């Protein structure tokens, strides 16, 4: 079946040993990278059923809906799967900052050649 994942028209996610796939989340309007998370079968089903992004928390071992406590939910515009069906791309409309720090994106620091971090001005806390 693995060799057919790149040619089939069926959604057949290839979960890792922990039952997860990587989910890359981008703003559907700006294409800005917002966050990377993990989804299990329940998170995928909940996202498809509700139109709101759900993920699996590895630290809490629990299903969670983005924005559940903050109100900064992610409305699904489109879900794509990569050629191996082991990673997902979620194009979303964010209702606020995607990062728990209050920033638009979780990727707000650049790693410099010397190993230092530079905070990016275009992703200031809001």
From Swiss-Prot:
Per its record, the protein catalyses:
1-(5-phospho-beta-D-ribosyl)-5'-AMP + H2O = 1-(5-phospho-beta-D-ribosyl)-5-[(5-phospho-beta-D-ribosylamino)methylideneamino]imidazole-4-carboxamide
Q: Which leading EC class covers this enzyme? A: hydrolase
Tell me the pathway: Amino-acid biosynthesis; L-histidine biosynthesis; L-histidine from 5-phospho-alpha-D-ribose 1-diphosphate: step 3/9
Annotated EC: 3.5.4.19
Q: Which cofactor does it need?
A: Mg(2+); Zn(2+)
Q: How is the cofactor bound?
A: Binds 1 Mg(2+) ion per subunit.
Write out the residues that bind Zn(2+).
83, 99, 106
Q: Which residues bind Mg(2+)?
A: 82, 84, 86
Family assignment? Belongs to the PRA-CH family.
Know the name of this protein?
Phosphoribosyl-AMP cyclohydrolase
Give the organism's phylogenetic lineage.
Bacteria, Pseudomonadati, Pseudomonadota, Alphaproteobacteria, Sphingomonadales
Whichever gene encodes this chain, its name is hisI
């Amino acid at each position: 079946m693995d060799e057919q994942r790149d040619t089939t028209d069926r959604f057949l996610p290839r979960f890792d040993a922990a039952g997860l796939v990587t989910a890359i989340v981008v703003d559907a309007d700006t294409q800005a990278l917002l966050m990377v998370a993990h989804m299990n079968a329940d998170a995928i089903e909940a996202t498809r059923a509700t139109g709101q992004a759900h993920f699996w928390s590895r630290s809490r071992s629990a299903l969670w809906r983005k924005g559940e406590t903050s109100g900064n939910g992610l409305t699904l515009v489109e879900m794509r799967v990569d050629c191996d069906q082991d990673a997902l791309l979620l194009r979303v409309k964010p209702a606020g900052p995607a990062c728990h720090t209050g920033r638009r994106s979780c990727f707000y620091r650049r790693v410099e050649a010397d190993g230092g971090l530079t905070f990016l001005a275009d992703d200031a806390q809001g």
